[in-house]
Structures are given as C-alpha cells and as structure tokens.
Regions:
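AMP-binding/adenylate-forming catalytic core of the ANL superfamily
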Residues: 120-122, 259-262, 269, 395, ...
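Conserved AMP-binding/adenylate-forming
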Residues: 297, 304, 310-325, 329-428, ...
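Conserved C-terminal "lid"/linker of ANL adenylate-forming enzymes
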Residues: 473-478, 483, 503-547
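Conserved AMP-binding/adenylate-forming core of the ANL superfamily
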Residues: 5, 26-79, 83-87, 104-109, ...
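Structural core segment of the AMP-binding/adenylate-forming
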Residues: 95-161, 479, 487-491, 500, ...
Length: 547
C-alpha cells in the first residue's frame, strides 16, 4: 500500500490483503452437497476481495466515467458484490450513498431525490425502481447493473466493468476529512437525514470498535446488521453472512443465524435486539444453546433489558458477554457496557427507574450533558452532575454534518472554540462514577399539564420488570402520562388484574406514580431498520384516539 492512500478507508483492506492474502474475508451459504446434502459455503479471500475491487475501480473510472467526489447511489443486496462495489468506490474516492430500503418507498425516494446522485449501481429491482420513479432519480447519468439485465436498463453490467488486466488500482489520495460516504438515519425519530462520513471517521470508528471489543485479525464474525460487516472486514475478521433479510431483522430465523455461527465457529455475533429475542426464544424452546466458540455479542438499535442479558447468559453461559455500544448513525462508538456490569448492579438500577446505563465514555470522545431545549444553542455549558439534560458529543467518530440540510445542522451542531459538537437528541445524565445513563429521546419526554417532565425510559425500566409485560412504553396524551403495555403471549394474570398490579408497582417510584391510565397494545410498532425502537409517536396518537 502506498503512503498516498493511507488515509483512505479502503487501505485497511489493502493491509490485510498484504499480510494475510489467503485468509477468508467473506463467506456465504451456497449450494447443497449433491451427495450428503451438507450446505456448502462460497468464500472470498482478502487478496481476492482486494484485487476484485481494484478491477472494478478501474472499470468504474475508465468505462463508467465515475470520478472522485461523485455521489453514487448504491442499491446492492448483501453478498460479495456489495463489498466489492463499496471498496471499489472508496478506492476511487467516490461517495457511495447508502439508503436503507427498509424505511419505506416514500421516504426512500425522498432521500434519493434530496441527494442528487449522478450514478446508480443497483440490482435489477433497483434499476427498475429508478425507471418507474424517474423523477426521484432524475440526476442519474450513469448506471451499472449488478446481476444481469443491463441491456434493459441502460449503462453497463457489473462484469463489463471488471478490468483485472489493469492490475493494482492507485488508491485515491484522500484527506482524513474527505467525504467517504453518505449514510442515512433510519427515520425512526423524524425524517431520515443524510449523515456525512469521512474517511478519517470510518477508520477511527473501525479501530475504536476493534480496541473496545478486543477484536483481533483472524477472528470470525456473523453480522445481522450489514453496515457493521464492512468494519469487520476492515478489522481483518472473516465475515459469514447469515441467510436473513437484513432489512427486516425481526423476521430473522434463529436457525439461519445459528447455522452461520456453527459453520464459522464464530467469535462474534452482531445483531439488533430483535434478532437476539429470536435466538433466545429458540434456545429456551430447546433448553439451551451450544456456541462454544462465541466470545461476544454486539447489539445495536435500541437498549436491551436486563432480562435479555440474564436470559442469554442462562442459555450460553458466563463466558459470552453481550455488549451494547452507545451511539447513533451520526456518532459511534461513544461508550459501551456489557452484560457483566449490567447484571452486577446497573440493571437493578434500571429496574428501579434510573434509566439505562450505557457505560463510561471512551477516551476519544468529549461528552457534555447540557440543558434541554428544542431550538438552536450557541454554547455547551454542562448541567450539574446527576441532572438530566441533552447528551452532546465531540470527537473523531462524530459526523461533521448532515448533507444539504442547513436547518438541521443549525440545530444539531454547535460550533465552539473547542470544535464542533453534536447534539444527540437523547437525554440522560452522568452518575457519580462517570457512567452515562440514557433516559430516552428528547422529543419523547412528557411535559405534564400540572408541571414537570417525565422521561419515559426511566419509567419503562420499572414496568418491564413485571413477568407478564413483554414491553412497556410511556407516552404523553394531553399532558398526562399513559402506560401502554405489550403483554406476553402467556400471562399469569387477567388484563384487569395486570392493570392493578402495574399501578401498585408505579407507587414505588415518584415519577411512575403519576401514571394513572394503562392501555394494552398487542404488538408495538417499531422502527424499520432495527425493528427494535418503539414508535412512540404512533403509540401516542393511538392512545389519544383510545380515550
């Protein structure tokens, strides 16, 4: 690897290709063995991934005409091509625009139109979508189709853009603050926003995650959250893709995830709380799980309850720890906490109404908890220790801006003499030992008509302790807190009995005792990306109609 490309995120792949060329970078289920029916897995080595992405980078540049800095909308399904295309674009210095199709068609098309990509790399279904909704894709001038059908949609095919005869591609000489990608937020707490990722930000995030988790090159990962897989490859891990719908993790079959874990003898599993719930349910039905190679589980998308930590430990033993890094699309990782710390005491405080402990901030991030306000601010003066405020962060893992959204930047970003701060939109506090506690989204706080504010996450931890409650959500209706319960399928109490029990439980907490109304909702609406964040605005609107 030349020094010229040393800041390029793709240089991490180049390093592993040089150090461990024949090691497996990617694996995914292929055909079944014709004789014994055993599932075969296709693999791609680090050398092959590096060389194939070099070959594609040449073709994208010379045959498709893509240039450094150009925005490229990327609609490629999980598989080898996803990684080849992504790495080729980074090497070229182009800017892949990644929009989660799980956010729904209307939101997806709005995001495409807002970012005006000049090129589209997509599977046939994505190309067809761009033709049907041509106004949203009006900026697209160049196309490459992955998977056949290029003649139908125009442009070139994936195979036609591979130029292996050209040899190594001269990786773009980018600065740490050069744009690498635009990743969209899930849209679960408002309109989806395009988050600028720089090459330095990507590289910093990968290295911090590797250090925090103790990841070593040569370990094996089964990711159920596709964006994380690019980090795993960059850290030198073998990534085995499970046979799941990555856009709908709640539909993931535990057998499919476990099959990938067993085949890979995986050290690491990455998934949303929805995936973990499916695996735990499967394990409890069978009286346990045998995962002797597994060292760690990483969860993203929403806090998980102490009960999930406890249930997983019962199934797999104490040697495997679930870690929950705290952060967001705009800033990750900021802190991390594991099962052992939660089960040693932090979880009990959650159950008593303290909120969710997300661990101590890492050294590379500055965290300030500032007074809660909804409009722009000009300073980040902290509230006293222990007081709830808005979590605000600054560091090399924090995105510098939302793309083409000046009004959102004016609210979310605060420029000071120290540098640019990002307001997370989360509320929380720092305890006496320096740990950060999450108390919910700022926009979900409940302002009471008699005065005062309730932070739902604190109360929900209390109500979630009841054995008949699958999940609880506290929302505001006309200035009153309303408890909404997703009951478990098998309940020991009738619903009227459960209401009385929960109201008695509420009397044990000064904030919770303000709850006087309990409603039932059989299956909570959740965000489309992780299928884990509760859609509180939808529940609040429903509760208002149910009066």
């Amino acid at each position: 690897m030349s020094a010229a490309g040393s800041h390029n995120f793709a240089s991490m792949l180049a390093g592993h290709a040089a150090d461990r060329p024949d090691a497996v970078a990617l694996a995914m289920a292929g055909d079944y063995h014709p004789e014994d029916g055993y599932r075969l897995y296709d693999t791609l080595s680090f050398k092959a991934l590096h060389e194939r992405s070099d070959a594609l980078a040449w073709g994208l540049q010379e045959r498709l005409g893509i240039t450094p800095g150009e925005r490229v909308s990327m609609l490629v399904t999980p598989g080898f091509e996803f990684f080849v295309v992504g790495m080729a674009l980074y090497k070229l210095g182009a800017v892949p625009v990644l929009i989660d199709p799980g956010m729904g068609r209307e939101g997806f098309l709005r995001c495409v139109a807002a970012n005006q990509p000049s090129a589209l790399i997509a599977i046939p279904a994505g190309q067809a979508l761009s033709r049907v909704f041509s106004s949203s894709f009006g900026s697209v001038k160049r196309r490459m189709t992955v998977g056949g059908g290029a003649w139908l949609f125009g442009g070139l095919s994936y195979d036609a853009c591979l130029m292996p005869e050209r040899g190594p591609f001269p990786m773009a000489d980018v600065a740490p603050d050069s744009e690498a990608s635009i990743l969209f937020t899930s849209g679960s707490t408002g309109p989806a926003k395009g988050v600028v990722y720089t090459h330095g930000m990507f590289t910093t995030q990968a290295r911090l995650i590797g250090r925090m988790m103790g990841i070593r090159a040569g370990e094996s990962d089964v990711p159920c959250f596709l964006p994380f897989a690019m980090f795993s490859v960059s850290l030198g891990m073998t990534v085995t893709l499970p046979e799941i719908n990555f856009s709908k993790p709640a539909t993931a079959k535990a057998k499919a995830v476990l099959a990938a874990l067993h085949h890979a003898q995986a050290d690491q599993l990455v998934g949303s709380p929805a995936v973990m719930a499916r695996i735990i349910e499967h394990g409890e039905e069978r009286g346990g799980l045998r995962l002797p190679h597994l060292k760690r589980v990483l969860t993203f998308g929403a806090p998980i309850s102490p009960a999930i930590h406890e249930a997983f430990r019962r199934l797999v033993g104490e040697n495997v720890e679930i870690f929950t890094p705290y952060g967001a699309t705009e800033a990750l990782p900021l802190s991390v906490i594991g099962s052992r710390e939660i089960l040693a005491g932090a979880g009990a405080k959650t159950a008593a109404g303290a909120g969710t402990c997300v661990g101590r901030p890492i050294d590379e991030v500055a965290v300030r908890v500032i007074p809660i306000t909804d409009g722009p601010v000009s300073a980040v003066d902290p509230v006293p220790q222990g007081e709830i405020g808005e979590i605000t962060v600054r560091g090399p893992m924090v995105s510098p801006e939302y793309k083409e959204l000046p009004q959102e930047n004016a609210v979310a970003k605060v420029d000071t003499a120290e540098g640019r701060w990002h307001r997370m939109g989360d509320v929380g506090y720092v305890d006496e030992s320096g740990r950060l506690w999450f108390c919910g989204r700022k926009s979900h706080r409940v302002t009471l008509k008699e005065g005062g504010v309730i932070f739902p996450d604190r109360l929900e931890g209390l109500f979630n302790t009841h054995p008949d409650v699958a999940r609880a959500a506290v929302v505001g209706v006309a200035g009153e807190p309303v408890l909404i319960v997703e009951p478990k399928e098998k309940m020991s109490l009738r619903r009227d009995e459960l209401v009385r029990a929960l109201l008695v439980l509420a009397q044990t907490n000064d904030e919770a005792r303000r709850v006087r109304r309990v409603l039932f909702y059989d299956r909570f609406p959740v965000d489309r990306r992780h299928n884990a964040k509760i859609d509180r605005p939808a529940l609040a609107a429903w509760a208002a109609r149910a009066r």
